[in-house]
Amino acid sequence: MLSISNAPTVADTGERILAAAASCVVDFGVDRVTLAEIARRAGVSRPTVYRRWPDTKSIVAALLTRHVSEAMRDAPLLGDDRESLVRQIVTVADLLRRDRLVMSVLHSELAPIYITERLGTSQHMLIDALAARLAVAQRTGSVRAGDPVQMATMVLLIAQSTIQSAQIVEPILDADALAGELAHSLNGYLS
């Protein structure tokens, strides 16, 4: 019998579910992930999964938000100026472009939902973070005047397009060239 101190916590269960979902997305592609397989891999019942997320799309959305948050954490902002912000954006874009889960979602039937039909949680999170950082850079004079939220949204569109299209332009723009051109585009837009 498990003692209370050895029983899995609610957070542990949620983490197991997310880890199981991530492995399903990578193994099968996002279009073939089932809630039953997520539950099986997590070692929990389907009702346990349903208590946390209403459907598979919600779990995938939570995973995307987590991966975007991790990319932002792994690419810290090293200054308040435009160049530092652009370096961070380019690094985040590169991390997301190399993320198997993110790319699986972007190449799935769900992609239009995340790209063209609505802004998701992770996109709102990025816009908010970018807007705050752009406002600081505007105060230092390294970013042009303008509505920080609108500018952040445009930066998101530029970076998102780069991430989505990187694979098709790879014969022309390798990873280093892509990063350089993205930085040039962003510096030009924000100057």
Name each model-derived stretch.
Residues 1-28, 32-41, 57-61, 69-70:
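Basic, helix-initiating cap at the start of DNA-binding domains
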Residues 42-53:
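Short hydrophobic/aromatic patch on the recognition helix
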Residues 53, 64, 159:
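DNA major-groove recognition helix of helix-turn-helix
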Residues 62, 73-100, 115, 152-155, ...:
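Hydrophobic alpha-helical connector segments
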Residues 104, 139-184:
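Hydrophobic/aromatic-rich alpha-helical bundle segments in the mid-to-C-terminal region
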Residues 106-114:
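Short linear capping/connector segments at secondary-structure termini
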Residues 113-140, 149-153:
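Amphipathic alpha-helical packing segments from all-alpha helical-bundle domains
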